[in-house]
Regions:
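Conserved catalytic network of the ASCE P-loop NTPase/AAA+ motor domain
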Residues: 16-17, 42-44, 82-84, 111-115, ...
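Conserved beta-strand scaffold positions in the cores of enzyme catalytic domains, especially
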Residues: 22-24, 49-51, 88-91, 188-190
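P-loop NTPase motor core
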Residues: 111-184
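Short, well-ordered alpha-helix to beta-strand connector turns
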Residues: 19-21, 46-47, 86, 157, ...
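Soluble or luminal CAZymes and related metallo-dependent hydrolases
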Residues: 6, 99, 141-145
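Conserved inter-motif catalytic segment of the P-loop NTP-binding fold
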Residues: 52-132
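Phosphate-binding/switch region of NTP-binding enzymes
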Residues: 151-223
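The Walker A/P-loop phosphate-binding site
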Residues: 1-69, 81
Length: 223
C-alpha cells in the first residue's frame, strides 16, 4: 500500500519520539535536499547530526541558507548563525564500498556515542557498491553486515535516514541490492520533484526486529 506524505510530516515523524528509526528515501536528486532539510531542523534544536556521504552530495550552503531563512522569517526568537548549526554536524566520506562498510560497522557506533549524536544520515550508501570492480559476492556479504550494524544502532536508540538516488544498472544482481536494503528499513519513501512540486510516496511500513548475532553471516552464505 502506498500513500502520499507531506514533507513536513515526514521530517517531524522521523525526529519524533521514540528514537531508533530506520528510514529510507529514494528517488531523484531531491532526496538529498529533503534529508538536509530534516538535518537542519534537528540541528536547530541542538541535536548533533552525523552524516556519512558516499556520493559527494553534502551541501554546506543549504544549511547556511536554512539558518538565514528561519531567522528572516522569524521562526525562532534569536538569530541563528549558520556556524552554530554547522559546528554540530559531523561529516564522514566514503569513496569505496569497503570504506563505506568500515565507516558504518566499525567507526560509526563508537563515534555517535562519543559525540552523543542520536541521528545519522547516510547519502548514497550503495553508490560505491555498484562498481563492477568489487566482486559481487563481497558486495552482498558487505551489505548484510551493514544492515546488521544499522539494526544494532537502532537498538541503541540511534535514528538513521538513508538517501539514495534511483539507478538502473546493467547488472540485474546489483539492481537487487537496493530492494534488499530498503526491505530492512522500518519505512521507505519514494521522492520526486516536478514543476508541480515535491511528491513523497510512503511505500512501506514494517515492524523490524533487530537482527540476531550471526544472521548477517548466515544470510550472506545463502546468497
Amino acid at each position: 500500500m502506498t500513500a502520499l506524505v507531506p514533507y513536513t510530516t515526514l521530517v517531524k515523524r522521523f525526529a519524533a519520539a521514540p528514537p531508533g528509526k530506520l528510514y529510507c528515501l529514494h528517488g531523484d536528486r531531491s532526496v538529498f535536499r529533503l534529508s538536509l532539510y530534516a538535518a537542519s531542523h534537528a540541528l536547530l534544536t541542538g541535536v548533533p547530526i552525523t552524516l556519512v556521504d558516499g556520493t559527494n552530495r553534502f551541501d554546506v550552503y543549504y544549511i547556511a541558507e536554512f539558518a538565514r531563512k528561519v531567522t528572516s522569517q522569524r521562526f525562532v526568537k534569536r538569530r541563528v548563525e549558520p556556524e552554530r548549526l554547522l559546528e554540530n554536524i559531523f561529516i564522514s566520506r566514503a569513496f569505496t564500498c569497503y570504506q563505506m562498510e568500515a565507516t558504518i560497522t566499525e567507526k560509526l557506533p563508537a563515534f555517535v556515542k562519543r559525540k552523543h549524536s542520536p541521528m545519522v544520515i547516510i547519502f548514497g550508501l550503495l553508490d560505491t557498491f555498484y562498481d563492477e570492480q568489487a566482486p559481487l559476492f563481497e558486495v552482498k556479504a558487505s551489505l548484510q553486515r551493514i544492515i546488521a550494524a544499522l539494526h544494532r544502532l537502532k537498538g541503541e536508540s540511534v535514528s538513521i535516514l538513508l538517501a539514495s538516488l534511483d539507478m538502473k544498472l546493467e547488472s540485474q544482481e546489483r539492481n537487487g541490492l537496493f530492494p534488499k536494503l530498503a526491505s530492512a528499513m522500518d519505512e521507505a519513501f519514494h521522492v520526486t520533484e516536478s514543476a508541480e512540486g515535491q511528491k513523497i510516496v510512503r511505500e512501506k511500513r514494517i515492524e523490524n526486529k533487530p537482527l540476531r548475532r550471526g544472521d548477517a553471516e548466515n544470510n550472506a552464505e545463502d546468497e
